[in-house]
Amino acid sequence: MASEKLKAAIIGSGNIGTDLMIKIMRHSEHLEMAAMVGIDAASDGLARAARLGVATTHEGVEGLTRLPVFDDIDFVFDATSAGAHVKNDAFLRALKPGIRLIDLTPAAIGPYCVPVVNLDAHLDSRNVNMVTCGGQATIPMVAAVSRVAKVHYAEIVASISSKSAGPGTRANIDEFTETTSKAIEAVGGAAKGKAIIVLNPAEPPVMMRDTVYVLSDLADRAQVEASIEAMAAAVHAYVPGYRLKQKVQFDEIAADVPLNIPGLGRFSGLKTSVFIEVEGAAHYLPAYAGNLDIMTSAALATAERMAQSLVQA
């Protein structure tokens, strides 16, 4: 007998929302795609949803509540913008207090969630924030070092193809850096975090690449490397295109020639450099859009576990 599936809606019919819809319909064990919500009647995402037999509305979150299927919806994925999510959460919560929102914007009303690091702690949350694409790719690496040694500082540089960044991503650049930096600390375990995003205009488009620099107490390098490799394998389980681009690199910062970290002061210890590449599954945009893929894959992995927990309960 097939397991019960819970109904889900997606707000935001752009690149992220459309990719997520395809993932749910092809791969979800516990969720059923029930509605696609947008604000542009001519958007490709709404057109695709309609062709696939999914209920659609171009009247935003208000339109969603007017759809006959709304009463049966348990999960809503929000792939709009940080500002819009705050309003969407309040509007939906007033009508259905128990509804689960998976926030794919940098709004961060609810706790940050990076599935491989802290999902178990948030299975009962009504609103979880998926940080950012850069956060989903890099925070696991910071956490991997954190479980071996105290991390004083972590800096990530996320480089994504300009073609993969839609208007929503571009409008949220400031929020991207702020939210990712905070989550590096809150989830990754760093005392201080910093995030940088680069939109690469290269043609042909390049795959998502991320660089992670971690400054920690001195530790056994083999243990740190093993922790990083194990964490990368865990992410790969739900993001098949996720991989370490090259071997982990280590540098020892001697006490007599310390680094000066703004806002942190002088540092000596172990510098760990991790280089990641994320190839997209090409469900909607081509394979270069790994940033899209890791965000939607993480969101789906989170909702799947939550739905499984609800069904079993």
UniProtKB/Swiss-Prot annotation:
Gene3D superfamilies: Dihydrodipicolinate Reductase, domain 2 (3.30.360.10), NAD(P)-binding Rossmann-like Domain (3.40.50.720). NAD(+) binds at residues 13-16, 164-172, 291. It comes from the Bacteria. Keywords: Aromatic hydrocarbons catabolism, NAD, Oxidoreductase. It holds the Pfam family AcetDehyd-dimer. One of its GO terms (biological process) is catabolic process. The keyword Ribonucleoprotein does not apply. Its EC number is 1.2.1.10. It catalyses: acetaldehyde + NAD(+) + CoA = acetyl-CoA + NADH + H(+). The keyword Cell cycle does not apply. GO terms for molecular function: acetaldehyde dehydrogenase (acetylating) activity; NAD binding. The active site is at residue 133. SUPFAM superfamilies: Glyceraldehyde-3-phosphate dehydrogenase-like, C-terminal domain, NAD(P)-binding Rossmann-fold domains. InterPro entries: Acetaldehyde_dehydrogenase, Acetylaldehyde_DH_C, NAD(P)-bd_dom_sf, Semialdehyde_DH_NAD-bd. HAMAP family: Ac_ald_DH_ac. Belongs to the acetaldehyde dehydrogenase family. This is Acetaldehyde dehydrogenase 3. It comes from Paraburkholderia xenovorans (strain LB400).
